[in-house]
């Protein structure tokens, strides 16, 4: 038979409400185990994550379970052992995952347990694969480079045709079809 407290402690209720509010503001969550990290290492990790507007919060598993349940999410498998959650917007989740895995290479005590990215549950291996993908800015720049390269090649071909014509060489443009 479970023993129940006679009354709820206001400090604990406030802590759960604060955590619920923070979880509600974020769209993605990356769960980590921080056992063995020093205060200096946690501070350095938080500083690196701040670049991505990420809040890295050490949570009590019971409080986090209550908060996630109130948000209609079940994450019990990630709330085992000392848990810290990186709260981040989906736009920056890739960069945060990359920072966490890079930090885990330097400090093996940090373990990424899994994530919920925009409502989809990822295990640790999927989060690691996700962290290796290029971010949104990199993808946009790669796309624009490809567009620019095609345009530059087209302009160079046109310029070569103009140069040949100026030299007096007759230029004929042949289509890819049959010329017979």
From Swiss-Prot:
GO molecular function: any one? structural constituent of ribosome
Query: Keywords in UniProt for this one?
Result: Ribonucleoprotein, Ribosomal protein, RNA-binding, rRNA-binding
Report TM segments: none
SUPFAM superfamilies recorded: Ribosomal protein L10-like
GO CC, sorted alphabetically, is:
large ribosomal subunit
Q: So what does this one do?
A: Forms part of the ribosomal stalk, playing a central role in the interaction of the ribosome with GTP-bound translation factors.
Which NCBIfam families does the entry link to?
PRK00099.1-1 (NF000955)
Q: What is the annotated quaternary arrangement, including any partners? A: Part of the ribosomal stalk of the 50S ribosomal subunit. The N-terminus interacts with L11 and the large rRNA to form the base of the stalk. The C-terminus forms an elongated spine to which L12 dimers bind in a sequential fashion forming a multimeric L10(L12)X complex.
Q: What is this protein called?
A: Large ribosomal subunit protein uL10
Species of origin reads: Treponema pallidum (strain Nichols)
Lineage here is: Bacteria, Pseudomonadati, Spirochaetota, Spirochaetia, Spirochaetales
């Amino acid at each position: 038979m479970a023993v129940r407290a006679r009354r709820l402690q206001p400090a604990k209720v406030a802590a759960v409400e604060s955590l619920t509010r923070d979880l509600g503001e974020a769209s993605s969550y990356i769960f980590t185990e921080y056992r063995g990290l020093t205060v200096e290492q946690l501070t350095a990790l938080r500083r690196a994550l701040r670049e991505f507007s990420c809040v890295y919060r050490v949570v009590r598993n019971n409080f986090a379970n209550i908060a996630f349940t109130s948000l209609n999410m079940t994450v019990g498998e990630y709330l085992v052992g000392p848990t810290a959650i990186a709260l981040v917007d989906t736009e920056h989740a890739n960069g945060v995952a990359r920072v966490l895995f890079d930090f885990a290479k330097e400090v093996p005590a940090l373990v990424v347990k899994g994530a919920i990215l925009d409502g989809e549950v990822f295990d640790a291996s999927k989060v690691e694969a996700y962290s290796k993908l290029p971010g949104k800015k990199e993808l946009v720049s790669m796309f624009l480079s490809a567009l620019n390269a095609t345009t530059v090649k087209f302009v160079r071909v046109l310029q070569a045709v103009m140069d040949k014509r100026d030299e007096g060489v007759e230029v004929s443009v042949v289509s890819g079809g049959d010329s017979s």
